[in-house]
Amino acid sequence: MAGLSSWFRIPEKFKILLILPVQIVMNFIAIIPFALTWYVGMTNWVPQLTIDWWRAQFIGPIAFVYAINDQIFLAAVARTLFIGAVVVPIEFLLGFLLAYVFLGKFIGRKFVTLVAVVPMMVVPAAGGYVFYLMFVESGPVNGLLQIFTGISISFLSNPTWALISIMLADIWQWTPFIFLIMSAALLSLPQEPINAAYVLGASKWYAFRRVIIPMLKRPMMIALLLRAIESLKIFDYPYMMTQGGPGYATQTITMNLYESGFKYLKYGKTATQSLIIFIACIIVAWYAVKPLRAAQRGE
């Protein structure tokens, strides 16, 4: 008992004991569904053929070969990566620019800042429906185009314009996310190095490039990483605006998995493809945070 009481007096060990039950429960909640998904992904389970998942034919790692050979799935992956490669840099540049402009004091700054973050508070499904009403053939966007140019564009039925419309909606909603992160980062910057640069004769542009940007490296990388991961989950806008169409022209990873699992009931194949995406995201995130860890060790 004496040894046990002395163990409790050690702050670090006592803290571990306090969080241990919660950690065990959380691990249990996370591991069981993951293990079940992994097993189902190794089968060809289709409820119409085999109602019980444990009776489905076990096909092993060959399931990954079947999943990767799905051309519609691969096209959805490529399309999602393309959307992310376009919208994330644009959102970052716009968000950072807004944060830097709003850094100064001016009349109505708080109100303008509040208006700027409103899109992020909108439910994505509702935002998708609003953009659908805007870009539909008889919507206000085409109405304005006909008034000023005399032309009409099939925004949601043309594959290229449908993809552009979805990306515009995504940029509208997620630019405020970058804006908030970079605003907080800019406000937390120490002013001494910046003022010292001005005293030494540096121009605003030079101080911005050589002093401010290096100090913002970590917040920038965090914002880009979080937004890049989030862009892989885009579902609401393609679903609400185009239903993945025309054809499969705007179908993303999440839409493909949704249709494969809930529409065609190919649970085994859907589980395998979900695991592929999960593993790929873990690998990318692992290498993406390496510079952050290196910067932290260097401080």
Regions found by a protein language model. Give the residues of each.
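A structural signal for multi-pass alpha-helical bundles of membrane permease subunits
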Residues: 11-299
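Short, Lys/Arg-rich, polar N-terminal cytosolic tail immediately upstream
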Residues: 1-10
